[in-house]
Amino acid sequence: MTMLAVNNLIAGHGLLTAVRDVSFDVEAGEVLGVIGANGAGKTTLFRTLAGVHSANSGSIALDGVDVTALSASRRVAGGIAMVPEGRRLFVDMTVRENLQVAGENGRSGAWTLSTVLAALPVLTSLLNVVTGGLSGGQRQAVAIGRALMSNPKVLLLDEVSLGLSPVAIEGLYEQLAGLKGRGDTAMIVVEQDLDRAMAFSDRVICMLEGRIALEGRPRVLGKPAITEAYFGLTHPESTHA
């Protein structure tokens, strides 16, 4: 079942077009990895999907419903949640308060405080801790938990491992693997680590200068082809596998 369908999306900042004619689908329970060098358009794509940026043209459909013109808050209510680069938590509030705020502004569903804590047990002992005092890995777990509290159909994870220690990254991806195993939420993950992206994703798209340069299943594409697309060594037309 297609959970998110993006068709011929064009978006940017002012006169700069950062996303150029991008199209892809994501199924329920599927993980789509988005890779590409800095400036490839990944973050603008995510912010456009979440409603933070407006699309210049093209369409975004969530579970069959066109959400292209909806505000960010209405997309959250409809089922799109983003874990942004840099976490952007309420640092003067406790973990519990951060989670509860998200729960009050999202959809009703299976994700509650108790189910989020079961999925992300690292948060259980941190509920009454002010978020500003947490480590990077702990903050990232809170950011993911906050997104889950809105009961998303599609979870956008932008640079989830950025700035984390290797140990924190391992712990984070163990938790994400648990979420993936549930099979009820589509995930789109921006990840700079190619090996990590290939191992965790069911499919990957590699962006180059705002376009999709390569798309397919990691094991079929192979790391050499993905690396070439990442650095712009392949023909700029989209390639599928």
Language-model-detected regions and their locations in the chain:
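Helix-to-loop junction immediately C-terminal to a conserved catalytic motif
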Residues: 50
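The feature captures the beta-strand-to-loop junction immediately N-terminal to the Walker
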Residues: 35-37
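Conserved ABC transporter NBD signature motif
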Residues: 58-65, 78, 111-112, 118, ...
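ABC ATPase NBD coupling module
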Residues: 54, 66-87, 113, 125-128, ...
